[in-house]
Structures are given as C-alpha cells and as structure tokens.
Design a protein with these regions (language model features):
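Cytochrome P450 core scaffold surrounding the K-helix E-X-X-R motif
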Residues: 40-46
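Histidine-centered active-site/metal-ligand motif
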Residues: 43, 60, 162
Length: 162
C-alpha cells in the first residue's frame, strides 16, 4: 500500500509498505477514506519532534471504514465508519481515568500515532492495542457532509463526536 513516510529531517517520501495486519486482540484495521495533514506532521518534517521515528508513516487525523477487528474489540465492527482519536492511551492509568489521555503514562501514550507508531497517511492503518477503548467514534452522515464540504449555508453540523 502507498504511505506518506517520514524518512529524515526535512524529508518525507511516498513509499510502498505492506498492508497492516492485526497483532493484538485490541487492534483494528481501518481503511482510510480521508486524511488530513496536521501542523504536527510539519513539526516532524522540520525536526522539531525528536521522538519521531524515521521510517514511520505519519498522520493522526483520519476517518475510514473498519475492515477487521481483534477479538477483544467490542465498540466497533467491520463496516463501521469511524473517526480516529489523535491520542493514543491505555485507558487504565491515573491520567486516563481522569480524562487526561494526552498525559497517559503508557510507553505509547500521548501522541504516538504517526510519530512513534505508523499513522494514517496511508491506505490502511492498524490502530494498535494502545489505542484506548474510546478512540474510535462513529462517523455519521452529518459529520461526513461537513468533512467533504457538502454542507449548505444554514445547515447545522456536529462539532464533536463525544
């Protein structure tokens, strides 16, 4: 599959990588339908994120369709349209339980997706066991309309998927 990959400071490349597969019971494979470049991706490119791993597929802002789920995944099923939380978190540590998932103490907690683990600037993304239970949200038709800019003046769209 085609991916947008961080190679080294100042250098990203379109690269072919194998399609991800389930590795853990809490994994999900999502076919990416829309992805966005974030200023965080640019910070990686410009060398401002020393923990970014060369060779990683960037991107943590995406939507898609669930293709496959591990045996412990209960909140989504294949065929569901989802939006992906930009934060990776365990859901069990002190900070996660208080709602401060960006401070998760797990080694892959905080901002890992597209920085330390392969992200969504690709055809498919594996959302690892380090993606907490609440990280996949249903994407409804109103949200899709807002994302694809098919909304008309006067329409009302959701601004969050909590």
């Amino acid at each position: 599959m085609l991916t947008y990959t961080y190679v080294s400071e100042g250098k990203f490349e379109l690269m072919e990588k194998p399609k991800p597969v389930l590795q853990h019971e809490r994994d999900a494979i999502v076919k990416v339908t829309l992805a966005s470049i974030c200023s965080s991706d640019l910070h990686i490119k410009h060398g401002s994120v020393p923990r970014a791993v060369p060779g990683i597929t960037v991107g943590h802002e995406m939507v898609g369709i669930v293709e496959e789920v591990g045996s412990a995944v209960t909140n989504v099923k294949p065929g569901d349209r989802v939006t992906v939380n930009v934060e990776t978190f365990c859901g069990e540590c002190f900070f996660c339980k208080k709602g401060f998932v960006n401070n998760c103490t797990d080694q892959n907690g905080g901002w890992a997706l597209g920085c330390r683990i392969d992200g969504g600037q690709a055809e498919y993304v594996r959302l690892s066991e380090h993606i907490g239970k609440l990280s996949l949200g249903y994407l409804n038709n109103t949200s899709t309309g807002a994302i694809k800019k098919t909304m008309e003046p006067g329409d009302i769209a959701t601004s969050g998927l909590a």
